[in-house]
């Protein structure tokens, strides 16, 4: 499954968030909670055979004096975590349906192949290793203030093979418009070339090297170009670009995080970003 971003343009105004799990109680009294699942199901219902394991930790808006606001946020979160077809469901129903589908797909897809392999092969242990599946989707609200909410989704999956795959996605939501915040909303004009240069310089500093070639010799920018991407988050120190495995470096190097300080990117920031960064830095003090 690919974790997708759904752009929701919702008519909502006049609500303000505070840090933590509860927003301004005098406004919409919005609170967040989570639903956990840890489900293991074996092929043919036989505990001696391989199994799939699904772990979910889904963060959602649990309460609000404005029901439409709560439902709109949850539709956004559900779509981002599980897919568009779940966005109209309640969080409880969506998690239940997603779990049922994962288990059903696992058994329907693999039981016929496993049965055939059992008939053709003698070594059951070598068969089982390739049929043990795993998926984890865990989300939480990473940042919340009067202007922005950052929702983080950590995803990992194993479907046989040498290793699994994992990724983290960050959704930055403008709380005044309830729409995603993109780089184009934060930087002035043609910012990409200058921002790319800053990313290279910071990555060199992080790795104690002085040239791009040295970074490439280490493995960076060998699986993809190092450039600004929409997978980023903001905190009191600056903006962090998060490159998942394979995006700019081999799997063995893991994910790459590059943080640019607000001071370094100040010449590129537009007015909205200046206000936003000031609020985030104030909250972090």
Predicted features, each with a name:
Residues 1-29:
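Bacterial Sec-dependent N-terminal signal peptides
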Residues 19-169, 175-285:
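Compositionally biased intrinsically disordered regions enriched in Thr/Gly
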